[in-house]
Amino acid sequence: MKTSVKFETIFPLTTAPLIQCITNEITCESMANALLYIDAKPIMADDPREFPQMFQQTSALVLNLGHLSQEREQSLLAASDYARQVNKLTVVDLVGYGASDIRNEVGEKLVHNQPTVVKGNLSEMRTFCQLVSHGRGVDGSPLDQSEEAIEELIQALRQQTQKFPQTVFLATGIQDVLVSQEQVIVLQNGVPELDCFTGTGDLVGALVAALLGEGNAPMTAAVAAVSYFNLCGEKAKTKSQGLADFRQNTLNQLSLLMKEKDWFEAVKGRVL
């Protein structure tokens, strides 16, 4: 794929960026370990009383809507407001957007603060763009992944960039769609098994934040994070005998794939 992304300079990370994650209990440990596997550093700090000092130390922030509660809502919104005040690099992950009105309201408030990257699966991002969506809970639907549906979403996300010109929008699925005010990229790596263990989208959000914290441009960080994770899944599939084995091998590949000099040559996609 011809793109301005210089994949060969992405890894290894050289600054050990400290990434603050306000996320859910289900995948909290997996996110923290994924960051460690790529030589970033996690801190799972969600108490607003700590934010002034935390924000002085961290390189980027992840705000994840998964497992929403009143207390977590307060933390997410407080962190989002503070991040905007201090121009903190921020990834907003719209987990389960469309599942409830409360979740939608919180998500809209987070996006209103102009985060660096906004992500979700194709169904979540269709709901965000007020398109018909067939997603259920936190899962995307195959009905939202046809070529026609993806093209419709691309056009809707282009409209969103008019309201949020500094934000890169990422929609993940059978194809991964990335839209900024300047360009549209569609990525085509990955394997179906990545939908069969929980938290894959959360891990991608953490990887995006790490690459932002390392100093990469937003589109570069998003493209590289998605591509790297999907290629880890592809490599893991060749070594696995079941889904639990596949999950472990995917996580293993986060620290291993980057050691292959030309790993990025397997990236597939197109620039529109």
UniProtKB/Swiss-Prot annotation:
GO molecular function: ATP binding; hydroxyethylthiazole kinase activity; magnesium ion binding
InterPro entries recorded: Hyethyz_kinase (IPR000417), Ribokinase-like (IPR029056)
Signal peptide: none
Binding site for ATP: K119, T172
Residues binding substrate, per UniProt: M44, G199
Cofactor dependence: Mg(2+)
CDD domains: THZ_kinase (cd01170)
Gene Ontology biological process terms from the UniProt entry: thiamine biosynthetic process; thiamine diphosphate biosynthetic process
Protein EC: 2.7.1.50
Pathway membership, UniProt: Cofactor biosynthesis; thiamine diphosphate biosynthesis; 4-methyl-5-(2-phosphoethyl)-thiazole from 5-(2-hydroxyethyl)-4-methylthiazole: step 1/1
Keywords noted in UniProt: ATP-binding, Kinase, Magnesium, Metal-binding, Nucleotide-binding, Thiamine biosynthesis, Transferase
Enzyme class: transferase
Catalyzed chemical reaction(s): 5-(2-hydroxyethyl)-4-methylthiazole + ATP = 4-methyl-5-(2-phosphooxyethyl)-thiazole + ADP + H(+)
Summary of the function given for this chain in its UniProt record: Catalyzes the phosphorylation of the hydroxyl group of 4-methyl-5-beta-hydroxyethylthiazole (THZ).
Annotated family: Belongs to the Thz kinase family.
Protein name from the UniProt record: Hydroxyethylthiazole kinase
Organism: Enterococcus faecalis (strain ATCC 700802 / V583)
